């Protein structure tokens, strides 16, 4: 019966586990344990796994008994090592061409029959029952092997014999993880774990090997058995693919290799050789030395020139340009070679390539400046070029890693206790960390390089000096003693003067010194027809010295940091995995040694069952294997630390089908640990959820405490126990009691609380509120769905008629502190999902809306916070206590900063001072003295100055002064609306002053001239969009004292009459000032509106609309909206300023004093008597 030996692929690593330990364990087993499957129908030992593992070369703590004891008649013994290693092979890869197949096996051929001398599997150890989690630490302490020695330290244990072919030798410790090799790259040696052999045993072994080679002509396999005089067999595992066939006995045994890696696309040999050669060139010491010298030259040469005093000569300039051109060529070649050798690893995905390219291009700017006869000293003055070049050069600091690896890196010693050296992980750490450090340092350097030191001689001072010289030369002449004395004095005080030309004539010149300096080190000042050149090399020298020091300092810092990073990365140890890896390697090695015997028995047993008829040899062999296995079991129990009694439970044949594999046990143990961790994680997550819920409940209790505090303060303040907050809270509780188990029950709008404006279709427009209670208005102000900015502006401007600022802050605080118990009925409170959903969808949005409302309140309508300690206390509690507790520290800090900034910039309005009436002497003086202001200055200049005065008064008017008809109160108007009162008084003063100027002239001709000036003044006011001033003029001309002067009006020119008629048409009150409203609606520039019209509109809105809807608690919000629209119309003109200069000469003569309406009337009568 034919049997087939199959080599299976390693088991796939479970990559779905949360921890990376399983990945490394499975990778270690996959690398070290090729799995064999033995099909044996006679002994029913199918699918038995035999592992051949070769891990670290350590031989300590692994004392195993002799395997495969054999004698001619059963009495002799011999020790041999079985090492069946099958590795994957890729014939196209040059890595495997030098390796030949090698299969070491111990077989004896007698009378054409093959007898296997391999031990049967060992009895069960049951490690799963004995080595559990509690004694795992004890096991680690007892059986952790020492670090793996390197090949150079194993001269006493291993001697590697050189074969006729060359192989790639790699240490099998975990330091080889970073090499990208297949299984066939590793040179395994399990003979290290064997005890020393005696001389007789060695001779018997050699005889057996010779018999084996002579008696197996039909077996096609590659045997390469190496032995040495030190009783250690160094076996070399090479990549083989073999097929064993025995036609005479009917045996067909095939061995299949691992599936090779996916082949790379074949590359042309010439191109590969060229790439290798180029890689060797750019990695050579000479190339690196040239690169470092080039970078140093580019970085420092220009600063050195500047620090040397900016010397200039053809030799210096051309030599430096030649070197820089050479560096450009060298850098270009370096970039091309890197592109060819590293391809995608260098371009285009890395920043190194682009900065190298920019650095290369930046050197071209030097040549460009030089060819255009500019200075060579570009880096010392041109900051941008310096920064680009430093960035491109400093990014090459990665050379430090190469230099370290080549000259400074030390080999890892066994005494260091490292199980994992720097590998791809370390290299990646170097690259990532180095790039971040370099970019950070370059960012700092970028900022510091902006510090360019200029000359301390101001340009304005030099130009002033040149102007003085030109004035002296034009006045006295260049040869005059006045000019000569001043110039000589200037020359003595300015030793850096190089060249002077005044009025196109050279006065002073130092050509030798000018030619010896760089062009940019000479400051050239031109003004009109004069030129002055000044030597600036001293300041350039100072700047270059500072730049040199800074550059050297940054380079030293980068070198030091990179050396530390590289050094640490090359000594990297994965400490958390040391113990696990030790367990894996120890158990897998012992499992490999035992399974070699079991697997060999299966293979050879298959041969014997089909080729021999005698069972005596098999029985004797079974007894020998049983005795050997007994000793091996004891050694394993002692080495692992297990004290199981199951060693006596073996069957008569010495085979235990239920023995667990140590690797399987380890994986099972890891699974159990993972299950325990998963259960613990779930428990922690559950407790975290519970803690989160409790934390939210504590937060609710905390904010509800502030609600009660606000309520208590409100009750104390309201002596008559008018309790709006308590009424609001009580209504909320009643609604909760009446609500159904729906989520938005409390947010439904009732006509008893709010009414909306009807649209054209007769349906309510939910965006326009017409009537609502104060509680509903507060809810709409802080809606969770969206923050209505228009509504907020209207409310915050007009709410004071129904709420005080303190009450509004209390309501907003309560709204911010809203909790599920205040908004959700009991049925929904019982559901954690509903509560959490409400917190996410409602509570957070409501708090954000309250934050936006307070931010708008403080930012625009902040006059409520001035001198109001109660309001400040509430605001301070909200910002410093409640909001931080609710995890809104950033929001609290933001609005607190706005509040502090507004308080710091607050300027209190000056107290109102009423205009004192004129005394009798002042009245007499006004009537007698002639006022020539309208004739002494241009009428446009007078109009501009009056406009500027009126705009200053207009822009000082606050929005709150328009509320509740404050300017109409008889006793409180000067306190509530002081700026409006001042503006109105100014209107009357100007109007009376113009009337006085007209009627105080005794002659008609003089009065006509004054009337023409006054009408012209009105025209200029209209051109300036000063309709307030235009109305002042119109009211003075239409006054009874001026309009009655018929004889005077008859002599006014027709052009002035037409201008007056045009002004009267514009400001006509017909159709509610239709013409004026149309004109001002089109005004897009600075403007002073006629404020009397808007005061009339506010009066009409206030008196024509009720505050409440039909004696209910519904506030007429439409009225508030109309008031806000009118006020905002006025306020929009305050934000556009007039950009004219004040004329103090005109303002000093503006004295808007008038004797009063009665005296003006009498003066008018004296000008023209009444008609009888």
Swiss-Prot record:
Residues 34-70, 78-87, 194-241 have a biased composition (Low complexity). Its main location: membrane. Residues 666-702 form a coiled coil. It is a multi-pass membrane protein. Residues 765-903 form the N-terminal Ras-GEF domain. GO terms for molecular function: guanyl-nucleotide exchange factor activity. It is found in: Membrane. The chain crosses the membrane at residues 286-306, 320-340, 347-367, 378-400, 432-452, 545-565. Pfam families: RasGEF (PF00617), RasGEF_N (PF00618). InterPro entries: Ras-like_GEF, Ras-like_Gua-exchang_fac_N, Ras_G-nucl-exch_fac_CS, Ras_GEF_dom_sf, RASGEF_cat_dom, RASGEF_cat_dom_sf. Residues 938-1170 form the Ras-GEF domain. GO terms for cellular component: plasma membrane. Keywords: Coiled coil, Guanine-nucleotide releasing factor, Membrane, Transmembrane, Transmembrane helix. Promotes the exchange of Ras-bound GDP by GTP. This is Ras guanine nucleotide exchange factor W. It comes from Dictyostelium discoideum (Social amoeba).
